[in-house]
């Protein structure tokens, strides 16, 4: 299994650099099973941190690291309902463009908020709408409620294709305390007509 995770240049880097990146992405698509594309320009929608010229590229590199680590963690970390390499392969092998989102939230509506963040990641150009292959992993402390898990999983299922292969996993992490983390990897949505890039999702303050 070969998964590519790449960034596209900031707009200020110029049209020529963007064209070179687009050409490289098209070539890379023929050499990987799945490809996650993160446009640097969308970083401004995805963080409350002030983005300066000095730290812009550092933030972009950290986003890449988080994307790769999220996939790696699903494979290597043992969960209560475990996801493994075979599950990741089932969704990402020969799958083309991929959506990968992680949401983390606390408070009364934490399950809904975390799931929506994962589904509508402001960093990506892809959309989970109509996805035909989905991995969803819900992580919380030992006292996470069954209803909260159901809410998060159902929101992901509703966004995917009715006949999608959905593989569900769950894990415990007491360091999250009152928070829930939802990780979503989705593929098989390239044929969806009219799919639009995701808009940022903001959870209301509790």
Descriptions of predicted regions:
Residues 1-206:
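Tubulin/FtsZ superfamily GTPase core signature
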């Amino acid at each position: 299994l070969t998964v590519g995770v790449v960034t596209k240049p900031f707009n200020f880097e110029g049209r020529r650099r963007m064209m070179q990146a687009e050409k490289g992405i098209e070539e890379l698509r023929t050499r990987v099973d799945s490809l996650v594309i993160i446009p640097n320009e969308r970083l401004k929608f995805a963080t409350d941190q002030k983005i300066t010229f000095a730290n812009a590229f550092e933030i972009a590199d950290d986003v890449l690291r988080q994307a790769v680590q999220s996939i790696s963690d699903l494979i290597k970390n043992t969960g209560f309902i475990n996801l493994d390499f075979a599950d990741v392969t089932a969704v990402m092998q020969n799958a083309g463009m991929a959506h990968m989102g992680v949401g983390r939230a606390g408070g009364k509506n934490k399950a809904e908020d975390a799931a929506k963040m994962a589904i509508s990641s402001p960093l990506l150009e892809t959309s989970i709408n109509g996805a035909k292959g989905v991995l969803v992993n819900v992580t919380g402390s030992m006292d996470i409620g069954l209803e909260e898990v159901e809410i998060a999983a159902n929101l992901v299922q509703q966004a995917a294709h009715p006949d999608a292969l959905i593989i569900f996993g769950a894990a415990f992490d007491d360091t999250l305390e009152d928070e829930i983390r939802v990780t979503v990897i989705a593929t098989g949505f390239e044929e969806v007509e009219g799919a639009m890039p995701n808009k940022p999702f903001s959870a209301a303050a509790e």
